[in-house]
A protein has these predicted regions:
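PLP-dependent amino-acid enzyme catalytic core
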Residues: 1-315
Length: 315
């Protein structure tokens, strides 16, 4: 029987898990860390999952008509995922983002057919959100999917990412580590894993200089993709056992090291999750545990950032 996907969105999910033997040895760990590699999604990141989920949810609720306009304030991977899914499904997509975002980011979503509206960089994401709301008021039948509030976000991780992981490891998951942007991944996967085994420990990761999940003040940081500066509605603290705060340089170093050791080119938030996973794995009680870390995206989106500025930012 032919094994042919009907459309690209059918290839979202079912990402592989790989053992990080050399990286773990470099860090002096007794047992190798395991990584779920989300850049195997067609759009190159974990956000393909929620882009498809939020659009399908809007369709099922009847708020998104065929050919309608989707608007979303996003400067990152969610925009890429939405652009890919919108292209497949025939929706118009307008993404609002600060004008400080890289040319690569803008051109990447344009390549999928999305329209980009830039807002003043000094206004940050709040400016992009305000522009999205303005556009929604002007365009009949348009919708804003609101990834930081949309229940379809953690629900998709509960329905897919969590079960995939459980099956891939034959239920032998002791600790799960993931960064928190919207919190959808760690909350959805965490809920599923704890339903299978309440003893599984769920570790959330945020920037040290913006430790809001640990009750601290928001602040600037270099770890793109996590640390929104507020606690999202899509983050479920009830399934989280611990929040690890990671410094910028530790995230950058781990991201670089896993590329050199394992051939895994990842983004800076993956570096943060890796560093946190190493810290957890070094504890004596975790020496023989299966620790899984989720790597959200590819490093190709960060080649012009501090992550790969080897000459200007040596570590």
């Amino acid at each position: 029987m032919a094994n042919i996907a009907k459309q690209l969105t059918d290839l979202i999910g079912n990402t592989p898990v790989v053992e990080l033997g050399k990286f773990s040895a470099l860090k002096g760990l007794k047992k190798p860390l395991l990584a779920k590699v989300e850049y195997f999604n067609p759009g190159g990141s974990v956000k393909d999952r929620i882009a498809l989920a939020m659009i399908e949810d809007a369709e099922q609720r009847g708020v998104l008509a065929p050919g309608a306009t989707i608007i979303e304030p996003t400067s990152g991977n969610t925009g890429v995922g939405l652009a890919l899914v919108s292209a497949v499904k025939g929706y118009k997509l307008i993404l609002t983002m600060p004008d400080t975002m890289s040319i690569e980011r803008r051109n990447l979503v344009k390549a999928y057919g999305a329209e980009v509206r830039l807002t003043p960089g000094k206004d940050g994401m709040k400016g992009a959100i305000a522009e999205a709301e303005k556009l929604k008021a002007e365009i009949p039948g348009s919708v804003i999917l609101q990834q930081f509030e949309n229940k379809a976000n953690p629900a998709r991780h509960y329905a897919t990412t969590g079960p995939e992981l459980w099956k891939q490891l034959d239920g032998k998951v002791d600790v799960f580590v993931a960064g928190v942007g919207t919190g959808g991944t760690v909350s959805g996967v965490g809920k599923y894993l704890k339903e299978q085994n309440p003893d599984v420990r769920i570790v959330a990761v945020e920037p040290l200089s913006s430790p809001v999940l640990n009750g601290g003040q928001s602040g600037p940081h270099k770890i793109q993709g996590i640390g929104a500066g507020f606690v999202p509605q899509t983050y479920n603290a009830e399934v989280i056992d611990e929040v690890v705060d990671v410094a910028n340089d530790d995230a950058i170093l781990a991201g670089r090291e896993v590329g050199r050791q394992e051939g895994l080119l990842v983004g800076i938030s993956a570096g943060a999750a890796l560093h946190a996973a190493v810290e957890v794995a070094k504890r004596p009680e975790n020496a023989d545990k299966n620790i899984v870390v989720l790597l959200p995206d590819t490093g190709e989106r960060y080649l012009s950032t501090v992550l790969y500025a080897f000459d200007d930012y040596p570590l």
